[in-house]
């Protein structure tokens, strides 16, 4: 059973004003670095694979490509709740500072890889997992640090800036990766080190804990079940999109079925364990707070709908559109990042504004509008031809970025405002799990949908294209069985596999013009365009449905909700206190709580002092002081 201690050591007056800005700048730097490192490898993968001499045409090597990306994100999804709990127990700043140091050390280690082939791929995956552990410390505690540092009427602004940095970093990483990777693939890792050192020293020097603590035990069973369950599901997806026997995909493989069933069973067992242990990883009673539940459901659906979007655009631009417009494969990574900047711009415009306005008007109108607009942009992408004109593509990307900006900052602020002070670390961690797990699953889902769309069309398209260039029918038949995952990753890596698949002996006996066409930059992208378009249609439809459901969840969150512990004492300026989604403009007196069907955990003036697992906690009746 947990107990909370609320002996505040927070600064007051001018010191508090200075401290909150220091906390904002440092946590924003931390979140920015982590998010840049989530995406910087997407665009740098061609140079990394060439640098470590890993052949993308070997289907089994797709495991390394996927897990170089997924390993980092999986760790953040698995650990963020536990590390948020450790922040509640031992100090959010202490855990945050440790995370900055760990993240920096592994960023340096990633740049000293001397191996090649699969050994180098395994080393990068391992070091990325270590880097992700450091990033998990930062993600799990940054929102709670800001919520402690800022008053309720500025919290949306602070969390909005922090959230903007986190999502903008995903797009900045694309451009940075495109700039650095052609120079040396190791630069995409070492670039974070000096900023990490700066952030670590700054955090240890300037940040300090609020003094709010929770005594609790770590839910080891829950952590293990969740980690193993989610990992098994992702491993099952990884092997499911690889060929199996004579099938283009491996969903009938006993290994795939076993890992997927085992993963789902582990996650089901996790839910049972969480309802019974004294100090669960997921504090299920927090889901009785309507604003917390609705905000997290909306966040999960939005992340599932949009998590794989960036990868689709990178493949579309880097593997098809840019080569068709005369850009060499060596330069496609940089230009793919540049051409995606409208999405970043849209998000940077809408994110901070919606955060500030949501402090005044509540999260529901902005978050709901954001998901409705996102749904419409997915529908718009369905009508774009594969070889589109850039102007409408850029407009749709900018509007999609604005939609995410409208949603993200208000939704995050509403989630954090709904939590009692001593539960902010755990609550932020739970919210992070929803978002990060959904992002990881979204990547697997989008890759699966794309490959499903490609698999039905690719063989006959390849065969016809090869025969049209005078390739013998027997050779064309053999090459047409190229696994869909190989073609998809060749597209992602900006790689034309035709010369290697046909071999010098076949090319030497073809007319000179045909040999030139087959090994040129446009033949493979042109052939892949039709199958790729079918895959895009499936993926965009899925994204539109997920975002529409996120809009519905956002509508159901209720009116503005602020936990009663945030209310001002009588005699101060009137505070807006909301319980169970019902707003009131009545100031709350110290020692008095607002009675509602769910109950408000906490009291006016200074934090809650209840045991979260007992009556008077988030799920119980009025708290006592």
Language-model segments: residues:
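Transmembrane-helix exit segments and adjacent C-terminal regions of multi-pass membrane proteins
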Residues: 1-35, 291, 359, 371, ...
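Transmembrane-helix bundle of Major Facilitator Superfamily
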Residues: 2-204, 354, 381-382, 393
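Transmembrane core module of solute transporters
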Residues: 24-36, 40-73, 254-258, 266, ...
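Hydrophobic residues within membrane-embedded alpha-helical segments of Major Facilitator Superfamily
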Residues: 26, 33, 102, 109, ...
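Small-residue-rich transmembrane alpha-helices and their cytosolic helix-loop interfaces
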Residues: 31, 69, 73, 159-167, ...
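Interfacial helix-cap and linker-helix signal at transmembrane-aqueous boundaries
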Residues: 48-49, 86-87, 176-182, 237, ...
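C-terminal module of multi-pass small-molecule transporters
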Residues: 79, 91-100, 107-110, 114-123, ...
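Hydrophobic transmembrane-helix bundles of small-molecule transporters
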Residues: 182-297, 305, 616-625
